[in-house]
Amino acid sequence: PHQIYNVTWVITNVQTNTQANATSMLGTLTDAYPTLHVDLCDLVGNTWEPIVPDLRGWASYSSSKYGCKTADRKKQQQTYPFYVCPGHAPSLGPKGTHCGGAQDGFCAAWGCETTGEAWWKPTSSWDYITVKRGSSQDNSCEGKCNPLVLQFTQKGRQASWDGPKMWGLRLYRTGYDPIALFTVSRQVSTITPPQAMGPNLVLPDRKPPSRQSQTGSKVATQRPQTNESAPRSIAPTTMGPKRIGTGDRLINLVQGTYLALNATDPNKTKDCWLCLVSRPPYYEGIAILGNYSNQTNPPPSCLSIPQHKLTISEVSGQGLCIGTVPKTHQALCNETQQGHTGAHYLAAPNGTYWACNTGLTPCISMAVLNWTSDFCVLIELWPRVTYHQPEYVYTHFAKAVRFRREPISL
C-alpha cells in the first residue's frame, strides 16, 4: 500500500467526449487525491449554445444569457448559481425520490443535488466530490473566466475508482436549467517500467566459484637489444572487470560474514561453519535507530520497488518504530513515534528500509499508515547466514555404525 504511482485524474465532457482537465501527481492510491481545477466552459463546450435560424435562413444565437460562445455570455454565466447531482450511485439518493437519468442531469427532483454553489447550499454526507466556484482574474471574460474547484470528500477517498464516475451539473435560472454531464476517472501507472518475465538473467551466471591460481606469475627475461634503436612501447590493453558468477557472489557473502564475525568475536571463528540458507526467507531485518527525512512530496528514493520480500516475523533487534505498535511487537522498538498527520512521506536513510506490517518499503506514506493502522520498523537488510559448530556439520557426513536392514521374511 505504500508503493508510489503516477496518478492522473481526468475530467471528461460526456456530451462531446473531450477531455476538460487532466491533473497528474506522484503518490499512493490512498493519498493521491489532489484538488482539481476546471473551467465550466470546458465542461459545457458548445452544448449550451442553442442556435435558431432567422427568417433569412441565417443562423443566429438565441436570447439566452448563458453559454460559452461569446464573452458577454461567459460573463453573465458567472451570476447564475449551479448545482451538481451524482449519477454513479442512484441507490444512495434520497429515498422516495426519482433523480432521473443523464437526460435530466440526474437532477429530476429537488433533493438529488449533493454539491454546488447556490443559495440553499446543497450538500451530502455520502457523495465523492464537492464542486465550488473558483476565483477568476479575467474580468473581460475573453478567456476562461468560469473556474470550478473540485475536491474529493472522505467518502471519495475511500471509494473504488476502477472506472469513471458521472455527475450532472445544472445552472439555476428562470425557465429551463441547462445540463452539463461530466465524468471523473483515475489512471494509474507505475513509475518504473514493467519487468519482463524472461529470460532469467541469473541462469547464465550460474558458475562454480573460481579457484585460486596456484602458479605464481613469472617475469620473462629478454636478451639485450643489439641495435641502437629504442624498443617500441606497446600500450597496455584495458580490460573491463570480469563478471563473476553466482558461485563467487555467494562465496563473497560468506567471506564477508566471516570477516565481520572475526572482527567482533574472533574466538568463534577458530573452528566453525558458516552456511547460507537454502530456503526463504533468505534475508533478515535488523532493527536500527536512524534519522529519516520528512517530505511533503515523494523523493526519488521512494519511487523504487524493493525486490526483496520480508515480514515482521523476520525482524530482530530493537530500533525506531513508527505508528501504533501492538503489544506483540513492542519488543522491536527502542523508540516509538506516532508519525505525522497529513500527506507526508517518511523516507528511510540510504541503505535502510521500513519493515511494515504490510511489507517492505523504502518510504512510508503517513496517509496509508494512519488509514490502515499500520506500523513500521526501521531496519537494515542482511542475508541470512547460519553459524554452526564443527560437530554439528560432521554428524551429517559421519557414517552410522549400524545400518537399518530388511526384516527377515519367514
UniProtKB/Swiss-Prot annotation:
Specific enzymatic cleavages in vivo yield mature proteins. Envelope glycoproteins are synthesized as an inactive precursor that is N-glycosylated and processed likely by host cell furin or by a furin-like protease in the Golgi to yield the mature SU and TM proteins. The cleavage site between SU and TM requires the minimal sequence [KR]-X-[KR]-R. Disulfide bonds join 85-107, 99-112. A motif (CXXC) lies at residues 272-275. Keywords: Cleavage on pair of basic residues, Disulfide bond, Fusion of virus membrane with host cell membrane, Fusion of virus membrane with host membrane, Glycoprotein, Host cell membrane, Host membrane, Host-virus interaction, Membrane, Viral attachment to host cell, Viral envelope protein, Viral penetration into host cytoplasm, Virion, Virus entry into host cell. SUPFAM superfamilies: ENV polyprotein, receptor-binding domain (SSF49830). Residues 210-230 have a biased composition (Polar residues). Residues 193-242 are annotated as: Disordered. This is Envelope glycoprotein.
